[in-house]
């Protein structure tokens, strides 16, 4: 028991710092400053403890002043330690519960075990090929390897510097400009960019310079019949052109009167085989078509006339007189032919309605007309409501039809023509019908597809004496009234147009007075 050593183990030898480093660090003064700082912090904590016990309000101004002094002193101490701490202060890679408390004050003159392990592994890897050589040879080999690494670093730095110069990296002016394009092309691109920028920002229209415009000299086939190109290369509508020949004006007026749709590339054109499209306000109109009615066409014509008048006011006076004379002559020719072509099929349509209503025997001949008559059935639907013919058609019912087709004439000629058409006797009307050209009537009758044993009637006088009105029985009286009403309507409408072509003197004021007297003597 006595032989057992009861002496404590020898105390570990205290590790001393390098004397030079210790002198530079000046640990004595640093220790004094740290102790005074600790006392100041302890005094502040005691003051807070006293405030908490006595439940008194602390003087925050004094406390903040003391805190600022303590904070400044601590900052000064840390800055002094930092100057020499790089030589012996080591920050470990891992922090655990054991060394967490001593990390702020860990001072050592040697590396931590994990850092020593990494250094040993790197050293062995570096000396792996030269360990068997003597020490001087190892030093030379290591120096040669260091020189090679330094040369590689210099080459890499040179390449990086050249690259920065070429692309302007790290400079204020940015990358250098690439080889520029042609000056003319660059100016065009800049001008186009400016126009687009103005159009987007200010809403200005893009105006191309004359050298970049594409002047259209020819139209596609489906637009050649509708649009007209003038000498300046601009596309104008037919109604806006002032120099239109008689044939072009006749084609435009025929399209407006008949209601025929213009040719389109998406579908075939049936100008001579099908009847016109129905109007948008017609009883037979559907949602698939939206052809404007005569009222809308009249409004469009009035708007175009106003535009033409404004253009005429800008021309010299002698040119205005010449253009006005040409337009009046073209309007008379086109209107006479257009009205004659548009009214006769309407009468034929009413003729077919009378036949369909008063068929009584199976052996009677039938004349089936083609069903789609959109442009003419508007007249039929308004005058003959629902296919039922009114037995006594008064003059007041015929006036709207006459007014609708005579609206395009001027005021004096319109009233004179209408009064002469109302008061002319039957003996004068029927001979005038023979003066109308039968060539315009035959193709229209061919469109309506006359079938059966009846020959094609090319004249209105043959229609009045047709055998389908010779029905016997109880319908004789009604057929006679229908014949009279149709004769009266045809005489009043077609006779008025015949007077336009053959007897223009009937439009004088004295004829208007005679017609007015005849209307008062023979009231309907």
UniProtKB/Swiss-Prot annotation:
Q: Which residues form the signal peptide?
A: none
Q: What is its main location?
A: nucleus
Task: Write down the superkingdom of origin.
Answer: Eukaryota
Q: Where is this region: Disordered?
A: 291-315, 474-524
User: What are the record's GO terms for cellular component?
Assistant: mediator complex
InterPro entries documented for this protein? MED8_plant (IPR038795)
Q: Which residues carry this modification: N-acetylmethionine?
A: 1
Name the Gene Ontology biological process terms: defense response to fungus; regulation of flower development
Knockout consequence?
Increased number of leaves and shorter petioles under vegetative conditions. Late-flowering phenotype when grown under both long-day and short-day conditions. Increased sensitivity to necrotrophic pathogens.
Coiled-coil regions listed in the entry: 137-162
Give the compositionally biased regions (Low complexity): 295-315, 474-505
Sorted alphabetically, which keywords does the UniProt record give?
Acetylation, Coiled coil, Nucleus, Transcription, Transcription regulation
Q: Per the similarity annotation, which family is this?
A: Belongs to the Mediator complex subunit 8 family.
Cite any additional comment in the entry. Named seth after the brother and murderer of the Egyptian fertility god Osiris.
Subunit-level organization: Component of the Mediator complex.
Instruction: Write out the function statement from the record.
Output: Component of the Mediator complex, a coactivator involved in the regulated transcription of nearly all RNA polymerase II-dependent genes. Mediator functions as a bridge to convey information from gene-specific regulatory proteins to the basal RNA polymerase II transcription machinery. The Mediator complex, having a compact conformation in its free form, is recruited to promoters by direct interactions with regulatory proteins and serves for the assembly of a functional preinitiation complex with RNA polymerase II and the general transcription factors.
Q: What is this protein called?
A: Mediator of RNA polymerase II transcription subunit 8
Record organism: Arabidopsis thaliana (Mouse-ear cress)
Classification of source organism: Eukaryota, Viridiplantae, Streptophyta, Embryophyta, Tracheophyta
């Amino acid at each position: 028991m006595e032989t057992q050593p009861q002496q404590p183990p020898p105390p570990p030898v205290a590790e001393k710092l390098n004397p030079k480093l210790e002198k530079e660090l000046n640990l004595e003064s640093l220790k004094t400053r740290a102790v005074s700082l600790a006392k100041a912090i302890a005094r502040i904590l005691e003051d807070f403890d006293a405030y908490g016990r006595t439940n008194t309000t602390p003087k925050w101004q004094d406390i903040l002043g003391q805190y600022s002094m303590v904070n400044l002193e601590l900052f000064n101490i840390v800055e002094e330690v930092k100057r020499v701490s790089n030589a012996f202060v080591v920050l470990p890679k891992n922090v655990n519960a054991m060394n967490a408390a001593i990390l702020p004050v860990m001072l050592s003159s040697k590396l931590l075990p994990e850092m020593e392990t990494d250094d040993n592994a790197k050293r062995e890897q570096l000396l792996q090929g030269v360990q068997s050589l003597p020490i001087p040879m190892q030093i030379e080999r290591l120096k040669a390897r260091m020189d090679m690494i330094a040369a590689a670093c210099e080459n890499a730095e040179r390449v990086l510097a050249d690259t920065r110069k070429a692309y302007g990296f790290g400079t204020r002016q940015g990358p250098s400009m690439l080889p520029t394009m042609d000056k003319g092309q660059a100016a065009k691109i800049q001008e186009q960019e400016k126009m687009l920028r103005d159009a987007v920002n200010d809403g200005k229209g893009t105006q191309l310079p004359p050298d970049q415009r594409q002047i259209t000299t020819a139209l596609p086939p489906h637009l050649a019949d509708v649009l007209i190109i003038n000498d300046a290369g601009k596309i104008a509508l037919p109604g806006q052109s002032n120099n239109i020949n008689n044939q072009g004006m006749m084609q435009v007026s025929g399209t407006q009167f008949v209601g025929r749709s213009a040719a389109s590339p998406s579908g075939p054109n049936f100008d001579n085989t099908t009847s016109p499209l129905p109007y948008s306000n017609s009883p037979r109109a559907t949602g698939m078509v939206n052809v404007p009615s005569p009222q809308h066409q009249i409004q469009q014509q009035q708007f175009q006339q106003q535009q033409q008048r404004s253009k005429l006011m800008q021309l010299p006076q002698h040119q205005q007189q010449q253009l006005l004379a040409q337009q009046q002559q073209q309007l008379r020719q086109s209107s006479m032919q257009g009205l004659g072509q548009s009214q006769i099929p309407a009468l034929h349509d009413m003729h077919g309605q009378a036949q369909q209503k008063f068929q009584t025997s199976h052996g009677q001949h039938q004349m089936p007309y083609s069903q789609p008559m959109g442009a003419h059935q508007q007249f039929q639907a308004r005058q003959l409501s629902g296919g039922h013919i009114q037995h006594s058609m008064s003059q007041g019912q015929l006036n709207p039809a006459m007014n609708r087709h005579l609206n395009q004439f001027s005021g004096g000629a319109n009233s004179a023509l209408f009064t002469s058409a109302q008061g002319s006797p039957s003996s004068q009307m029927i001979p005038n019908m023979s003066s109308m050209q039968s060539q315009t009537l035959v193709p229209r009758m061919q469109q309506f597809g006359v079938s059966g044993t009846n020959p094609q009637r090319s004249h209105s006088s043959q229609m009045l004496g047709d055998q389908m009105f010779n029905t016997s029985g109880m319908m004789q009286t009604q057929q006679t009234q229908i014949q009279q009403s149709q004769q009266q309507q045809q005489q009043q409408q077609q006779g008025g147009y015949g007077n336009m072509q053959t007897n223009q003197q009937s439009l004088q004021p004295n004829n208007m007075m005679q017609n007015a007297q005849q209307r008062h003597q023979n009231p309907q």
